[in-house]
Amino acid sequence: MSRVFLGAVLAASLAALPCVAGAQSKMVIKASDVHPPGYPNIVAMENMGKKLEKETNGRITMQMYHSMQLGGEKEMIEQAQVGALQIARVSVGALGPIVDDLNVFNMPFIFRDENHMRKVIDGPIGAELLEKVTASPARLVGLGWMDAGTRNVYTSKPITKPADLKGLKMRTMGNPLFVETMNAMGGNGVPLGYNELYSALQTKVVDGAENNPPSMLTANHYQVVKVYSLTGHLIIPEMFVFSKASWDKLSKEDQALIRKHSREVQMEQRVLWDKYVSEAETKLKAAGVQFVPADKEAFFKATQPIRDKYGAKYAALQKRVLDTK
């Protein structure tokens, strides 16, 4: 661990300790996300901090750590578990080992579209999964959900059906489920670190990748490949959690206040996200990226074996998700 990184962690830990001021304790909520300033997650969380500060007359404030200043998702979870960090925005994949049912969201086409996903996380299923995180021994409190968009494939040629991916090496996230999903879609899934992808595209180590439009833009992948095909195979929500070690030190009133504003974050972030995606698509098109419709039904059928294999243990939950209207 570098001295710079260790220093940031220690600073976060010390600053998060409550200090007594009269009869009430002051608290600096340390919040962390891997994304850069201006990203919808960051903006929504910063707005929450402003509301908390205003409603508590400055007794509760928030400090936002962005751009992996406190490490990646694994490190953020570990820091939250010991109270060195209060709020961490993490992926479902990172929380899957804590609450196994969360893995149902990693399956291809589990959601029809983003509106379907939002209805699920806003409803009983979303609430139950937040509570399962809270009830787990992981010492985390599930606060709310965030939208991470729809993942589609991008390469140097249009991909409208599974046969179009034949022979193409496509970068995927590391989970074997995602590799097998890409293989079922017709390509050759290649697990690769996100930070390695730009050079891998340049050198043809991989022929393409899959992600949302903002990621294609901000990572500059559009400079190498110019066709974005709307397969819509993955729509994976994300969660933000609170350190239970810190949560238990809060009054019931402060807990209720944070929960109230967490719900607002969940609603606000998606509005910011939709605008962010629209702006990213406009910029990509201006840079010469071609957006191509794809036969989603063909890809859905091609990935049915993946849902059968990985979804068997979540059959009841999977049915509830699919039945949500």
Question: What are the residue ranges of the model-derived segments?
Answer:
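Sec/Tat signal peptide C-region and signal peptidase I cleavage site
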Residues: 17-23
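Positively charged n-region of N-terminal signal peptides that target proteins for export
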Residues: 1-4
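N-terminal secretory/targeting leader peptides
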Residues: 7, 24-116, 125, 131-325
